[in-house]
Swiss-Prot record:
InterPro entries: GS/SS, Starch_synth_cat_dom. Belongs to the glycosyltransferase 1 family. Bacterial/plant glycogen synthase subfamily. It is an enzyme of class 2 (transferase). Its main location: plastid. May be involved in starch synthesis in endosperm amyloplasts and contribute to the deposition of transient starch in chloroplasts of leaves. It comes from Oryza sativa subsp. japonica. This is Soluble starch synthase 2-1, chloroplastic/amyloplastic. The lineage of its organism: Eukaryota, Viridiplantae, Streptophyta, Embryophyta, Tracheophyta. ADP-alpha-D-glucose binds at residue 272. Expressed in endosperm, leaves, and weakly in roots. GO terms for cellular component: amyloplast; chloroplast. GO terms for biological process: amylopectin biosynthetic process; starch biosynthetic process. Pathway: Glycan biosynthesis; starch biosynthesis. Disulfide bonds: none annotated. The gene is SSII-1.
């Protein structure tokens, strides 16, 4: 009985499931198939298995914990487990080649084969005695020790090699790992096998070539070097660099480079209504600095100066209508920006989320359908991204259809099976809700209706696009720890808390960063004219005074250096608490302050801005619309930033404000609670003021304390400014965490 059980585990007879063995089920990440889990729990980059059993096993496998390395599974732990449970029925032999991705030459080393006794006598090297097992274990330890030594040498070399040289090496390795029909997998003597190379003819994309730098001197790929020459080149480069660890942020990512395609409805500086546009414009650059190949796909709302047409036009059917898409491309700061052009996007240039429900839905359907095929049909830098090493990063409900399409159109039909999707929740309040009849616009099989159907106690069954995306995505993210907690509650989940709690195993929060090349008072291009000035931590007092005077002059306010300037920048809707400011306006108007508000959104709230300006013209300005230049200048010239949001997933404006020495007053919710520490006058700590309830009187109380400190305790005020400016708010920190999630999705099976 036991022999039969072990034999069924290890079928087919004589197979080897160690990393890089090509005679079994084919390589997964690291060579072998991934260990199945009853809950499909993902495997993080730091805990990736180096040994796994075949997926066709019907037994439920528990997780094998490795005590030393923290990995979920390892060769040693797995084989010890097998030894303890079926010692007399399993022997260890040496068989197929052990290939370490990008390092080990096929045939230069031998790998461990775990084989059943039945029908495998020719592969046995031990016997059922303790002596045989002891010899086997010694051989195991020797092979594992040698493997670890080789991999450690490789990692050390990568740490020493400069970023530019590493890119050259990666190009060499990547080129030699491209599969082609004339050279079947594993037949070339000189090939380097890449971590994610896939040998299946039907499933592998031929456009997997990775390019990391398009400069002519680095785009030439050497395809004819043999193994020894490549390894020698790596060693020479590593030895030519001084001892020490590289400070280059891509160093830690060099071993696990992936292709990332971020898809969003907006992207700064081309289109922006809120924080999503900033994230789409800045996060990809930080990921690219870590060595990954990164693309951003967004609609083309008008004619932009930078992009150029690339690739052939494609046609997609949306709601029964054929729509032609033209792809435009720009390469900026190491990132490919691809714009989806169709007349359906043009008429919403000034309000990208405008129009009726069905018009918006059609735009998002077209965006997702076109974006998911970009890695096949848009040869950025001459090479398509391909789908063998690919993770899509979708954002909010606008692109929540992408994980669903990836599954329905491709995975279910055997295509792009190694591509993964991650969905980021920026704002759960906007969900893409509609009647069930809207399902006809999505062009999906009828059996996918249940994925979208959600019951609302007030409206009955309805179609919910965000709900479907959350269920279909391989990983789920949101933009702060506080918001991640709120989304699991009935109050903060907006009806999706149940689905999010069910997906808790794949869900986490990562606090956003900011683009410190764009938002930086030292080099802000919007402060170089019209009387504004750049400034630093050392010159913040004089610099902000000059920017305040220039801002007052530009907007037609009295130029007074002693009056505190309060700014509000954001979308005009119920979430942002604009009505709380209006309710507190009688008190604010009596405080000898100037209030400047910038934003666009609901018509009634736009009218509120105009009304407040007309009623208090000597001290209030309400700018309806959005101007990136004015947003930068307001952040530099204001003393206080007001953010009374009822809920705020992360918020970026408070981060921009602190970077510029502007003190935030915020409602303690979501990411605002995570990023703005309440001021403590006794310990001289904190970054601003917070209030606990979204009520006008609480806003007045917090703002009153802030104004009192500004007028009467200048030393404390300057301390607040300096502490805010001294923080590291860059995207590089957040990008490391995003990278871990993307890799976890990539290795999820």
């Amino acid at each position: 009985m036991a022999a039969a059980a072990v034999s069924s585990l290890l079928a087919p007879s004589g197979s080897c499931y160690s990393p890089g063995c090509h005679s079994c089920w084919g390589p997964g990440p690291g060579g072998g198939r991934r260990l199945p889990s009853p809950r499909r729990r993902p495997i993080t980059a730091a805990a990736r298995p180096t040994w796994a059993v075949p997926r066709r096993s019907r037994l439920e496998w528990g997780r094998v914990e490795a005590q030393n390395s923290g990995a979920r599974t390892s060769c040693r732990a797995a084989l010890q487990w097998l030894s303890s449970t079926a010692r007399s029925h399993v022997n260890v032999g040496y068989g197929s080649p052990l290939v370490f991705p990008g390092l080990t030459k096929p045939g230069s080393s031998r790998c461990l084969c775990v084989v059943g006794m039945v029908g495998n006598a020719g592969n046995q090297v031990g016997d059922d005695s303790d002596d045989g097992i002891k010899v086997t274990n010694e051989k195991l330890r020797a092979v594992i020790r040698k493997s670890k030594e080789v991999l450690e040498i490789h990692r050390n070399l990568l740490e020493k090699i400069s970023a530019s040289e590493r890119k050259k090496i990666t190009s060499i390795i990547e080129d030699s790992s491209i599969y082609n029909e004339q050279d079947p997998f594993g037949q070339r003597d000189s090939s380097f096998y890449h971590l994610d190379e896939v040998p299946d003819d039907d499933e592998f994309s031929y456009d997997l070539q990775m390019y990391l730098d398009r400069r002519p001197d680095q785009s030439e790929v050497v395809a004819t070097q043999d193994y020894e020459a490549q390894l020698s080149q790596i060693s020479e480069m590593g030895q030519s660099v001084a001892e020490g660890t590289s400070d280059d942020p891509s160093a830690s990512a060099a071993v696990d480079l992936i292709n990332i395609i971020l898809v969003a409805a907006e992207c700064a500086p081309w289109s922006k209504t809120g924080g999503l546009g900033d994230v789409a414009g800045a996060l990809p650059k930080a990921l690219a600095r870590r060595g990954h190949r990164v693309m951003v796909v967004v609609p083309m709302y008008k004619n932009y100066a930078e992009p150029q047409q690339l690739g052939e036009p494609r046609r997609y059917q949306v709601a029964g209508q054929d729509m032609e898409v033209i792809y435009y491309h720009a390469y900026i700061d190491g990132v490919d920006f691809v714009f989806i052009d169709n007349p359906i996007f043009h008429h919403v240039e000034n309000d990208i989320y405008g129009g009726d429900r069905t018009d918006i839905l059609k735009r998002m359907v077209l965006l997702c359908k076109a974006a998911i095929e970009v890695p096949w049909y848009v040869p950025c830098g001459g090479y398509c991204y391909g789908d063998g090493n690919l993770v899509f990063l979708a954002n909010d409900w606008h692109t929540a259809l992408l994980p669903v399409y990836l599954k329905a159109y491709y995975h279910d039909n055997g295509f792009m099976i190694y591509a993964r999707s991650v969905l980021v929740i920026h704002n759960i309040a906007h969900q893409g809700r509609g009647p069930l009849d809207d399902f006809s616009y999505l062009d999906l099989p009828v059996d996918y209706m249940d994925l979208f159907k959600l019951y609302d106690p007030f409206g009955g069954d309805h179609l919910n696009i965000f709900a479907a995306g959350i269920k279909a995505a391989d990983r789920l993210l949101t933009v702060s720890h506080g918001y991640a907690w709120e989304l699991k509650t009935a109050e903060g989940g907006w009806g999706l808390h149940g689905i999010i709690n069910e997906s808790d195993w794949k869900f986490q929060g990562i606090v956003n960063g900011i683009d410190t090349t764009d938002w930086n008072p030292r080099c802000d291009i919007h402060l170089k004219s019209d009387g504004y000035t750049n400034y630093s931590l050392e010159t913040v007092q004089a610099g902000k005074q000059q920017c305040k005077a220039a801002l007052q002059k530009e907007l037609g306010l009295p130029v007074r250096g002693d009056v505190p300037v309060i700014a509000f920048i954001g979308r005009l809707d119920h979430q942002k608490g604009v009505d709380l400011i209006a309710e507190a306006m009688p008190w604010i108007a009596g405080q000898d302050v100037q209030l400047i508000m910038l934003g666009t959104g609901r018509q009634d709230l736009e009218d509120t801005l105009r009304r407040l300006e007309s009623q208090h013209y000597d001290r209030v300005r309400g700018w309806v619309g959005f101007s990136i230049r004015l947003a930068h200048r307001m952040t530099a010239g204001a003393d206080i930033l007001l953010m009374p949001s009822r809920f705020e997933p992360c918020g970026l404006n408070q981060l921009y404000a602190m970077m510029y020495g502007t003190v935030p007053v915020v409602h303690a919710v979501g990411g605002l609670r995570d990023t703005v520490e309440h001021y403590n006058p006794y310990e001289e700590s904190g970054l601003g003021w917070t209030f606990e309830k979204a009520e006008a009187n609480r806003l007045i109380d917090a703002l009153g304390h802030c104004l009192n400190t500004y007028r009467n305790y200048r030393t404390s005020w300057e301390g607040l400014q300096k502490r805010g400016m001294m923080q590291d708010l860059s995207w590089d920190n957040a990008a490391k965490l995003y990278e871990e999630v993307l890799l976890a999705a990539k290795y999820q099976w």
